[in-house]
Design a protein with these regions (language model features):
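Membrane-anchoring alpha-helices and their flanking helix-loop junctions
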Residues: 1-65, 70-166
């Protein structure tokens, strides 16, 4: 409600087709990360998370240790790019800070709660998306989360795109 009531302000740039295309691709990646984060995620508040953290890295966790939060961060960035006005920046900036700051805070909290299990998980995953691949810690083929997750991510992305007002 507060966002809708805030004075909009002028657009700082006109989002052209290139921005919309890049934004759509990033929204799709964010959707895939979000969907994948719901499967075998030791960061979720669940009993036995330490057992999950000891399992082999799988799916989107090869891309980042915090796929849900990076999905939210990508969504925030895209919304700022396609709606570049002050009220939008306040809203999406808050979402971005919450997503990335929350991820960093979650690393500290899980390290305290899970000890060696989280330390091991953190050593086998990377905070930054594609950080393991870019640093040479993991081969690029591990960045493919699997056909099922990609297809479900596409369905989620299409569904949200269909119902989302522009």
């Amino acid at each position: 409600m507060a966002f809708r009531s805030a004075p909009r302000g002028d657009y700082l740039w006109v989002p052209d087709d290139r921005i919309w295309a890049i934004g759509s691709a990033l929204m799709l990646l964010g959707s895939i990360l979000f969907v994948g984060s719901l499967i075998g995620n030791p960061a979720l508040p669940a009993p036995g998370a330490d057992v999950v953290a000891k399992k082999p890295v799988h799916g989107v966790f090869h891309i980042t240790r915090h796929p849900m939060m990076w999905g939210f961060a990508l969504w925030a960035i895209v919304h700022a790019l396609v709606a570049p006005y002050p009220a939008s920046f306040a809203f999406t900036g808050g979402m971005l800070i919450l997503a990335l700051g929350g991820s960093a805070g979650q690393d500290k909290k899980k390290a305290a709660l899970m000890g060696a299990a989280w330390a091991d998980w953190s050593a086998r995953t990377h905070f930054m998306p594609f950080g393991a691949q870019l640093s040479g810690k993991a081969p690029w083929k591990t960045a493919w989360p699997g056909l099922t997750l990609v297809l479900i991510g596409i369905i989620v992305w299409l569904g949200i795109t269909y119902v989302h007002p522009m």
